[in-house]
Amino acid sequence: MHFHERFDVIVVGGGHAGTEAALAAARMGSKTLLLTHNIDTLGQMSCNPAIGGIGKGHLVKEIDALGGAMAIATDYAGIQFRTLNSSKGPAVRATRAQADRALYRQKIQNILQNQPNLRIFQQAVDDLIVENHQVVGVVTQMGLAFESPAVVLTTGTFLSGKIHIGLENYSGGRAGDPPAIALANRLRELPIRVGRLKTGTPPRIDANTIDFSQMTEQKGDSPLPVMSFMGDVSHHPKQISCWITHTNEKTHEIIRGGLDRSPMYSGVIEGIGPRYCPSIEDKIHRFADKSSHQIFIEPEGLNTNEIYPNGISTSLPFDVQLNLVRSIKGMENAEIMRPGYAIEYDYFDPRDLKNSLETKAINGLFFAGQINGTTGYEEAGAQGLLAGMNASLQVQGKEAWCPRRDEAYLGVLVDDLSTLGTKEPYRMFTSRAEYRLLLREDNADIRLTAKGRELGLVDDARWAEFSEKLESIELELQRLRGQWVHPNSPLIHALNPHLNTPISREASFEELLRRPEMDYSKLMQIEGFGPGLEDPQAAEQVQIQVKYSGYIQRQQEEINKAVRNENTGLPLTLDYKEVPGLSNEVIAKLNNHKPETIGQASRISGITPAAISILLVHLKKRGLLRKSA
């Protein structure tokens, strides 16, 4: 049975990738359908109740700069905000928010339900309709067919999902939700490489059974940060504390004693887990010399007693879980409200994707989120936005777009996945970006909002606020460069007490700000130098642009050299056996990866600069040299 309407874009799945994908396509004017197995769980935080962190916060800011919903929802749901690495340079500073699960879900659902061009329908998808390597629609579990030339799959952990607690296991997409078996079987028929990954979650604890007096309190920052460039502290709900405790030798003994019933260590789980978010049993095994591990005690919301003990993700049997929890200081009498578990699921090799996140095998079929081998809400949301945007561009007959590695962490994420693939759940870190001085949280809007406006992702309100901010930054920089103070100036008496060494020659306000002992706020408080900018975001930009101008310029020069051949396109139909001079190893790797550009090819392990030179010569001889968009 066919549904009576045809859609421009269909998004399957309503998690963090699916919601951003659907919103992006709809914002760009595409008639969009979001299909979910349960409308009530749209925007659900399935694992930890937090958004942001090192690398991840950068992605959230980029989603926000492109008009996405994640940062806005976090500002309305965040019950504790902190700036991580605040004592370090601006490139690695990151915002992290503890979020109220219910408030976050409610805000996302409110944004979805009020988005023009977006229809939401509750049905699980069992099948894809593909004709001549082109997707033309989907079929739901009740046999209802929806037609569309572009489909974005954001299936999370649902594809052939299997939940493990001890040696017991059962099929599930996550606790309380059914898996997507039929769709997983259909996808395995496609010419896309498939694998298995696993992730896990800790047991949830009843706050009424925890003795917080034995733990270290961790308060949020003051003044409070905001996540969205459109955000305001007034959006934040009540702020509360988290706590810190630790495992001990007794905890470790209990865990070691239960490893014979661990699905990870008995061979029941085949999927590979996240390296940077290991289970507690994995920590004990891998770091046997450590006598304790830190645990963050995180409230799940303002109106619930559930506590998320971040650091003890586990799939051990329930009796072992209860014993290990009660061995931890402050949790001697703790009661578990939900057991921890591991979940195995299908993912597809992201090397089989274009950097638009469209599959190379099926036109119009896009993948985003954990289906591509990533882990984390932020990584999923960023991919979802990109996939939804490119699905809309394709329907409009326009070229796909993806930021380069020097333009966004989103560009780093997609390039890493589509070029190198992944054998384990991929998460973002600032260390993955070679140009991180330019890819800061604070300038995500300056990097991306103009492009977002051009693409149709950014609305009038965001554009007006951004334009005003940009103008104020430029005017203030001009003022600082154009105003000078000399040793005999009346301003000197107020200025010199704030300087390590008094000025001996005429200096601009910009030069004074560049001094290590000076910051923008301090300079503006000195009589004759203010009043300065009231907008803290704009003021921060002025300070960073002045103080780091030399470093930023040098990094930009590096980028200009690197991008010369970065976007030189490689035909996907090119058989590298036909390129004379390449080694058998290089031929095999290039034919296996099928890179889209010279830049992608150069980042494949084992591809030498000499091989790249041979490729460029071959392309030139054949008249195939072209720059991709």
UniProtKB/Swiss-Prot annotation:
GO terms for biological process: tRNA methylation; tRNA wobble uridine modification. Transmembrane segments: none annotated. Pfam families: GIDA, GIDA_C_1st, SAM_GIDA_C. Its cofactor is FAD. It is found in: Cytoplasm. Keywords: Cytoplasm, FAD, Flavoprotein, NAD, tRNA processing. FAD binds at residues 13-18. NAD(+) binds at residues 273-287. GO terms for cellular component: cytosol. It comes from the Bacteria. One of its GO terms (molecular function) is flavin adenine dinucleotide binding. The keyword Flavoprotein applies. Homodimer. Heterotetramer of two MnmE and two MnmG subunits. PANTHER family: GLUCOSE INHIBITED DIVISION PROTEIN A, PROTEIN MTO1 HOMOLOG, MITOCHONDRIAL. NAD-binding protein involved in the addition of a carboxymethylaminomethyl (cmnm) group at the wobble position (U34) of certain tRNAs, forming tRNA-cmnm(5)s(2)U34. Belongs to the MnmG family. This is tRNA uridine 5-carboxymethylaminomethyl modification enzyme MnmG. It comes from Shewanella baltica (strain OS185).
